[in-house]
Design a protein with these regions (language model features):
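Catalytic cores of peptidoglycan-degrading enzymes
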Residues: 130-257
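Intrinsically disordered, low-complexity Ser/Thr-rich linker and spacer segments
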Residues: 94, 126-131
Length: 257
């Protein structure tokens, strides 16, 4: 009877031990399944992230290509405008030189030659912007949002400055000159370009409207456009460049008045 009792106890103990092992194995199986599900979820998340990155890279490259194309169109438009205005610019440069010759001749004779108002205007608008020393007007009063040389996208950098201003504010010519371009350009909106002589020009983009047309003579501080957001930017602002011999240069050293 004692033997039979021990055997029953052993059987019960073994059964309990077996059930415990089965329970542990079941728990382990559940844990493995849960871990597998987590791994699968992590893999799917990683795939989504990689797909998103790939899409973002492609979108960035597409945007970069578009910006390069916009910049190329701007250069080509300016070159065409310069070519169209070349004959007049050369004629005015010769006339301005003739006035300077008169002044020099008078000086040699110990007298002075006083240019007429038209001659003074001619010399001013064909004499270039000179060395940058803060002598030019600010094109608009506002907050500088982007500076020359800052990163625009990828390897592209800002070729000018962006000034945030109230919509409809007057955009003013920074110096005397003649308008050679007033047109819509992709990426820059409504653009006005003023030629100042000697290869210098100023460019005003993102405008709501232009107050001048090609061929208009402008004076320093004269309103030439109204601030807008035609370049596709989120807020009203002015895109402003100075170009010297076709190359964009930092405009800020010229601006002071």
């Amino acid at each position: 009877t004692l033997f039979r009792s021990q055997t029953r106890e052993e059987v019960a103990s073994q059964k309990a031990e077996l059930e415990e092992k089965q329970s542990q194995q079941q728990t382990l199986l559940y844990d493995q399944q849960a871990q597998q599900e987590k791994l699968e979820q992590a893999r799917n998340e990683r795939k989504k992230t990689l797909a998103g990155l790939e899409s973002s890279i492609q979108a960035g490259q597409s945007q970069l290509s578009e910006m390069r194309a916009n910049e190329s169109r701007l250069r080509n438009s300016i070159a065409r405008a310069e070519a169209a205005a070349k004959a007049r610019a050369e004629k005015e440069a010769r006339e301005a030189q003739a006035v300077r010759n008169k002044q020099q001749e008078a000086s040699r004779k110990g007298t002075t030659y006083k240019p007429t108002e038209n001659e003074r205007s001619l010399m001013s608008r064909t004499g270039g912007l000179g060395s940058p020393r803060g002598q030019a007007y600010w094109p608009v009063r506002g907050t500088i949002l982007h500076r020359y040389g800052e990163q625009l996208q990828g390897e592209l950098r800002w070729k000018g400055i962006v000034i945030g201003a109230s919509e409809g504010s007057e955009v003013k010519a920074i110096a005397d000159g003649r308008v050679i371009l007033a047109d819509w350009l992709q990426g820059y909106g409504l653009v006005v370009v003023v030629e100042h002589g000697k290869g210098d020009m100023s460019l005003y983009g993102y405008n709501q409207s232009a107050l001048v047309s090609v061929g208009t003579q402008v004076r320093a501080g004269q309103p030439i456009a109204l601030v807008g957001s035609s370049g596709g930017q989120g807020r009203p602002s002015l895109y402003f460049e100075i170009r010297r011999q076709g190359q964009a240069v930092n405009p800020q050293p010229w601006l002071g008045r």
